[in-house]
């Protein structure tokens, strides 16, 4: 098992990326391959590939194709050639997404790959797709997202995943025309597997196993959840601090429970999002990822390798399309 990491991708590159890779190397099996300028990646105790160029966070998407010696391009190239089993990058979404679709290639029958992320819910995890790759989509694309989300959810352990369409209300007639059209298509293709419209709060409640959205709405929902998680933990800390001795004593007695809650709410624990619908495992880590987030992103990639997520999605899409009922 080999997982390549873009050492130069992200706001905190290269230091936090290197720290995260070293942390992950102690917890994952197989090799972690560093990709970046030789003077930065050598002598770190991990295999490396020298890359002289960098795709910057503000670079337009096409730069990933132009900069053939960049860490991002070379990582995707290694993946497409089968020399690594997964590629992780905290680099800019646009270039990474274009590179994944152009260099690694799209799965047959998928017009628009999407970002899929498993976010914590009261029932375990909810797959949110698309989490930020496609700002504007057609209703037909949302059906493809549902197929990929179902397959991903099954990989996570759901036996009969149910799908919800993110909307401004639960009623069937809510939302703009494209969403109404998507509702009808999902109802037609998925049958009883389609739950109907869901709202933002349903994602963390676990009302459904898969929430389908355009990339703009999905990304806003994801970032809102991240902010809410930080708010909850910050308010809890302040309340304990302001509550005096008894509050501090109670917090000490409940430290293990609080730590578990904090870990579950910590956005860094999500690790990263899969670019679903391409022929290899590509994980997009948050642009502001620190070492902990990078470590978890690499572990997400490891899990994708272990469960053969690309093959499962390919098989799941074929099965769902043929069955027409989402199972």
From Swiss-Prot:
Q: Does the keyword Transmembrane apply?
A: no
Q: What is its main location?
A: cytoplasm
Enzyme Commission identifier(s): 2.3.1.274
A single GO molecular-function term is: phosphate:acyl-[acyl carrier protein] acyltransferase activity
Q: One of this protein's GO BP terms? A: fatty acid biosynthetic process
| Pathway in which this enzyme or protein is active | Lipid metabolism; phospholipid metabolism
Q: Which UniProt keywords apply?
A: Cytoplasm, Lipid biosynthesis, Lipid metabolism, Phospholipid biosynthesis, Phospholipid metabolism, Transferase
Query: Which InterPro entries does the entry link to?
Result: FA_synthesis, Phospholipid_synth_PlsX-like
The leader peptide range reads none
- Keyword Transferase in the entry? The reply is yes
Q: Where in the cell is it found?
A: Cytoplasm
One GO CC term on file: cytoplasm
What does the record give as the reaction this protein catalyses?
Answer: a fatty acyl-[ACP] + phosphate = an acyl phosphate + holo-[ACP]
Give, as one word, the top-level EC class.
transferase
Role: Catalyzes the reversible formation of acyl-phosphate (acyl-PO(4)) from acyl-[acyl-carrier-protein] (acyl-ACP). This enzyme utilizes acyl-ACP as fatty acyl donor, but not acyl-CoA.
UniProt xrefs under PANTHER family:
FATTY ACID/PHOSPHOLIPID SYNTHESIS PROTEIN PLSX (PTHR30100), PHOSPHATE ACYLTRANSFERASE (PTHR30100:SF1)
- Complex and partners: Homodimer. Probably interacts with PlsY.
> Family per UniProt?
Belongs to the PlsX family.
What's the protein name?
Phosphate acyltransferase
Q: The organism's lineage?
A: Bacteria, Thermotogati, Thermotogota, Thermotogae, Thermotogales
Q: Which gene encodes it?
A: plsX
């Amino acid at each position: 098992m080999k997982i390549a990491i873009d050492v130069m991708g992200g706001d905190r590159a290269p230091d936090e990326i290197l720290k995260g890779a070293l942390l992950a190397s102690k917890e994952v099996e197989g090799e972690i391959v560093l990709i970046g300028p030789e003077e930065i990646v050598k002598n770190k105790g991990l295999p490396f590939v020298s890359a002289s160029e960098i795709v910057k966070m503000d670079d337009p998407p096409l730069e990933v194709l132009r900069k053939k010696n960049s860490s991002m391009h070379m990582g995707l190239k290694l993946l497409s050639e089968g020399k690594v089993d997964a590629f992780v990058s905290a680099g800019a979404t646009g270039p990474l997404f274009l590179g994944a679709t152009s260099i690694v290639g799209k799965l047959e029958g998928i017009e628009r790959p999407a970002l899929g992320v498993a976010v914590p819910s009261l029932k375990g995890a909810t797959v949110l797709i698309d989490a930020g790759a496609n700002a504007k989509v057609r209703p037909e694309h949302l059906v493809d997202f549902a197929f990929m989300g179902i397959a991903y959810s099954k990989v996570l352990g759901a036996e009969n995943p149910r799908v919800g369409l993110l909307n401004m209300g639960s009623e069937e007639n809510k939302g703009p025309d494209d969403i109404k059209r998507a509702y009808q298509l999902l109802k037609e293709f998925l049958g009883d597997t389609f739950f109907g419209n869901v709202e933002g709060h349903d994602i963390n409640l676990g009302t459904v196993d898969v929430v389908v959205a355009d990339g703009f709405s999905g990304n806003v929902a994801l970032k809102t959840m991240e902010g809410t998680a930080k708010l909850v933990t910050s308010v809890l800390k302040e309340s304990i601090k302001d509550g005096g001795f008894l509050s501090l004593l109670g917090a000490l007695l409940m430290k293990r429970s609080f730590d578990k809650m904090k870990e579950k709410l910590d956005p860094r624990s999500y690790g990263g999002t899969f670019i679903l619908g391409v022929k290899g495992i590509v994980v997009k880590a948050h642009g502001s990822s620190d070492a902990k987030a990078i470590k978890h992103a690499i572990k997400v990639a490891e899990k994708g390798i272990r469960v053969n997520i690309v093959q499962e999605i390919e098989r799941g899409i074929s099965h769902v399309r043929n069955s027409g009922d989402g199972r």
